[in-house]
């Protein structure tokens, strides 16, 4: 790893996704000015560079998640989240001035953490759990891919009696059914999503993004 620039050129980098703010936020309000200065310098160091030899590298800034309240394990939750919110806002301001994309993970993660009976997103308030990685990856995917054609969740409906089906995000054909089996063929029109690593009920904001399949008018029996 000789230098950052030489490594990015070696990899012919097209996009740099830069996550800042969690560690820096421990400097509190007093560290905000330096944080903004350093962030502007980081952006300036990459702007205009053609690491792939053809096009200017694209920068995306990503904020930290919120600090999760896990009881005695996570003291000073209110003050930590005040600082994290300040640093998230600072990143948003710099991104707007530099005209580069910005993804706010603080607000959506805080909203998920506030839901009672929800799965914990972190193991210690900061580091994501397996479920947390799944949930945050959904947020990132939606922000990165929003408004792109084909960015649809899979919704498949099969009418076993009529042998008809319809889909969103995929197309369905060759439907057949009997007392023991139902079969059909699907063609992907968008990417499938990974199942959550939990059997517990998901918050509505995440549940509505799940792929789903509904089979109607299925005769009783084992299939």
How would you label these PLM feature ranges?
Residues 9, 44, 48, 89-96, ...:
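Surface-exposed alpha-helical segments enriched in charged/polar residues
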Residues 1-45, 51-58, 63-76, 163-178, ...:
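Conserved SGNH/GDSL esterase-like catalytic core that processes O-acyl groups on lipids
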Residues 55-65, 81-119, 134-158, 221:
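Extracellular serine-dependent O-acyl
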Residues 17-18, 22, 46, 62-65, ...:
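Long, contiguous hydrophobic alpha-helical segments, chiefly transmembrane helices and signal peptides
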Residues 2, 29-37, 78-86, 126-135:
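Soluble non-cytosolic domains of exported or imported proteins
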Residues 73, 77, 84, 118-122, ...:
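Generic, low-specificity signal for short hydrophobic/alpha-helical stretches with a mild N-terminal bias
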Residues 97, 119-223:
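Conserved catalytic region of serine esterases and O-acyltransferases that act on ester linkages
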């Amino acid at each position: 790893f000789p230098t950052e620039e030489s490594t990015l050129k070696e990899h012919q980098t097209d996009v740099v996704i830069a996550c800042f703010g969690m560690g820096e936020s421990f400097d509190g309000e007093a560290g905000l000015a330096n944080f903004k200065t350093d962030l502007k310098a980081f952006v300036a160091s990459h702007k205009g560079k053609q690491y792939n030899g053809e096009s200017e590298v694209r920068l995306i800034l990503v904020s930290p998640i919120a600090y999760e309240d896990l009881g005695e394990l996570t003291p000073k939750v209110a003050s930590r989240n005040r600082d994290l919110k300040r640093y998230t806002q600072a990143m948003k301001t710099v991104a707007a001035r530099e005209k580069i994309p910005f993804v706010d993970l603080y607000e959506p993660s805080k909203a998920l953490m506030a839901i009672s009976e929800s799965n914990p997103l972190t193991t210690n308030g900061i580091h994501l759990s397996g479920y947390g990685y799944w949930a945050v990856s959904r947020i990132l995917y939606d922000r990165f891919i929003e408004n792109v054609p084909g960015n649809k969740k899979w919704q498949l409906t099969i009418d076993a009696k009529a042998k008809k089906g319809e889909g969103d995000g995929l197309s369905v054909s060759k439907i057949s059914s009997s007392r023991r089996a139902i079969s059909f063929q699907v063609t992907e029109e968008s990417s499938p999503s990974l199942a959550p690593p939990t059997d517990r009920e998901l918050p509505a904001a995440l549940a509505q993004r799940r792929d789903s399949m509904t089979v109607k008018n299925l005769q009783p029996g084992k299939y």
